[in-house]
Amino acid sequence: MRIALGIQYDGAAFCGWQAQPHGKTVQDALERALGEFACVPLHTTVAGRTDTGVHGLGQVVHFDTDLDRTDFSWVRGTNAFLPSTVSVQWAKPMPDTFHARFAAFERTYYYVLYVHPVRSPMLAGRAGWIHTPLDDDAMRAAAAHLIGEHDFSSFRSSECQSKTPVKHLYQIDVRRSGHFIHFRFRANAFLHHMVRNLMGCLVAVGRGRYPADWLADVLAGRDRTLAAPTFMADGLYLAHVGYPAEFAVPPAQLGSVPWSSVWADLDLPS
């Protein structure tokens, strides 16, 4: 039997998603909890591996098991062995054709950026921060150059294991709400550090360091050294993973963050 789980986690508490020998990752915590509840080792496959500091609101995993448990028992039973920084939100039996990674056709990330002369300790690990004003319109104009199917080598980390740098970026939204700017990135898939590298470039344009059309030149150059430095992970959230309707994957529970109303206005895809 194949079981899918919806997972939320505070990325600041972990050294990324992927299991490591030191055991301080989200996958390590989840698989330990599943093993405690199921009394047998269980291996999970994830929709998308996130880096240290990146949060998960709509992460999806699957695993195979012979155990017959109710959906909610997987939720409550696993959560009983998890730390407070990670939680199973839902569980659902799936056909063997479902695969958390390869069945997904799109991913959505949000970035929350606090724009204020003084940093807030209340937002540590929850939002990025910049002390200088940003030009929203300039960032929107720059983002427009990135929409479509392109070779995103200029925004790819040297450690990226993707077979191809070509991805289809469907949408970048920029929305201001008080001292916060909310960015939404939606694509069929993302390269390692791609969103954070895009953020670094958009912020550089927003600060007036480069014109909006500079980003078109960076994209065309296919060279990581042409782009701005990788932006901080603090405000980055994996918010949604899209699957074919036949799998009826439950939606991500975004109401657990204080700025969910702003994200709702951006019309998160179902």
Curated annotation (Swiss-Prot):
Family matches, as CDD domains: PseudoU_synth_EcTruA (cd02570)
Molecular-function GO term, any one: tRNA pseudouridine(38-40) synthase activity
Function, in words: Formation of pseudouridine at positions 38, 39 and 40 in the anticodon stem and loop of transfer RNAs.
Active-site feature positions: D51
Single GO BP term: tRNA pseudouridine synthesis
Organism superkingdom: Bacteria
Binding site for substrate: Y109
Source species of the chain: Burkholderia ambifaria (strain MC40-6)
Complex and partners: Homodimer.
Family of the protein in this entry: Belongs to the tRNA pseudouridine synthase TruA family.
Gene3D superfamilies: Pseudouridine synthase I, catalytic domain, C-terminal subdomain (3.30.70.660), Pseudouridine synthase I, catalytic domain, N-terminal subdomain (3.30.70.580)
Enzyme class: isomerase
Listed name of the protein: tRNA pseudouridine synthase A
